[in-house]
């Protein structure tokens, strides 16, 4: 027997639009300018699962049961009829001026609930809630930790070819919620995330002198890593996030330095 390739069929599942009571829908519409926040969060989950390549979210037009099923047991025969093997349901509402999402994951073939969770956060985090839901569903169905509630740090470029402006930027893994972390006054290169917290290290040419900087994304506070007479470059965090390894050039010779950024010690 000659095996030439593997064949993976994405799991068909249904992401039912999260239900929203009318009062909450109107409030979210005023706050976020969204017609239906339940539909929008469900779209985030659906797109994430599809992009993973492991799941095949079914077209909502094929659903036989109405989306407003947050408080009732699904009619599993209806979902099995459209070939769904898993089903996500839930609701969104305002509680104490915050967004609260409750969702359930159902095994259609077994006819039972296999996960139920709830999240409460500020309304502006609605897209992140969609990513967190996806992470939980992904882990429950695959056994692997999800990666959807993550962000990407990168160098954004703009301007003419002869005078490019480079800014340090961050965005969600799906390309939304872009935020610029620097103004573009100095060249920035090689940003690297700390694996354990919201710190970033990167190279910046302040007054044409290459230096390694440390930036706290949440507070916006940045600092130079070390006070060296020469240039520093190529920063990396250690796997535990407690140290920074970087290169240091002096008198045409390059050295490697390891620095504990929490204490400032080498």
Question: What would you call each of these model-derived segments?
Answer:
Residues 8-13, 52, 74, 82-87, ...:
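Extracytoplasmic
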Residues 91, 153-162, 200-207, 226, ...:
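Beta-strand C-termini and the immediately following turn/loop, strongest in propeller blades
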Residues 7-75, 88:
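Short beta-strand->alpha-helix linker/helix-N-cap micro-motif
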Residues 113-116, 176-180, 220-223:
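Predominantly a core beta-strand signature of beta-propeller blades
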Residues 256-263:
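Conserved small/polar residues in nucleotide/adenosyl-binding loops
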Residues 70-136:
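Amphipathic beta-strand/beta-sheet edge segments enriched in Tyr/Trp
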Residues 109, 172-176, 216-220:
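Short loop/turn segments that connect beta-strands within beta-propeller blades
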Residues 125-126, 140, 178, 185-203, ...:
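Conserved beta-propeller blade repeats
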